[in-house]
Every structure is written in C-alpha cells, then in structure tokens.
Amino acid sequence: LREAAVLVLLWGDPTRVLVVRKSCSIDSYWSCDIALPGGHIKPGEDPIRAALREAWEEAWIHPSMVKVQEILAPEKTLAGNRLIHPVVAVPKGPLCPRPASEEVDAVFWIPLSIVGVKPREIRHPRREMFVEGYRLAGGVLWGATLRILRRLYSMHSSNMEEP
C-alpha cells in the first residue's frame, strides 16, 4: 500500500478549495484529473511535509504561506493500492497559485459546495471508462478527490447547522 498526502487548502466565505488539473497533454494515469495538490510521501516525510512539498511543486504555494488546521482520516483509492492523507489548511495571506510543473496545466479555486450536488456518470476524457463525478475546466473531478471533498463538505455542512 503506497501512501500519499494532499493539501486541502480552504479559503473564503462561501468556502472554496484549491484544485489542480493534471496535464491533459502528457500520457499519465492522472491525465485530465481535477485533483488536490499532492503526491507520494517520501521516506522520512510525514503527511504534512509531503502535502506542503507537493503544493509547492505543483501550484507554487510556499509552505510558509499556509496554516495547517488538521489531518483528516485517510482515504483509500478504489484500486486499493494507495492510502491518501488529506491535510486541511488555510492561507496565511494572499496567494498567487499557478501551475508549477509539467504534470499540472491549471490551478484554480472551486466552491466546496459543488460536491453537494449529486455527481453524474460521465466519460473520462483520457480513460476508456465512465466515472461518477463532475466535468470542470476540461477535466474530471472524481474518485478519491471527490470522496475527500464530499466528506469535508458534509463536515462543514453539519458544523454550519449547529446553533
């Protein structure tokens, strides 16, 4: 089981989350996926360090510019070969995220509430399969990223209902 970490960077009211689009122009398992910045946990790293390193490598988010709030319970991929640790954080000030590597071709904020709408079955543009998710900015939000964001959305929704 390989371990990975993602940065779940939340900002604003209503809450938005930073996502990246994995490049559609390279032949990769993740091509055209809308994802949270993240990747493998290297030897000697913990999930926080890995998520912050990956956010810097993929979206020019410097580790000093975010405040980590919590680590959510890990999410297993459907293939079962990867365990993803979501690291929730907020910006300490203004950010200018942008693609920082050839594996990412877009970086943008989406409303967290988007995952409150039932996902549809759609054809993934780079895989020969249909997935349950959302089409966004030429990519597809689905799989473990979608499950992490839905879990976070339901936590936020229940917190907002309390008096």
Model-derived features with residue positions:
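Short, contiguous, pocket-lining structural segments
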Residues: 35, 140-144
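Buried hydrophobic packing segments
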Residues: 7-10, 145-152
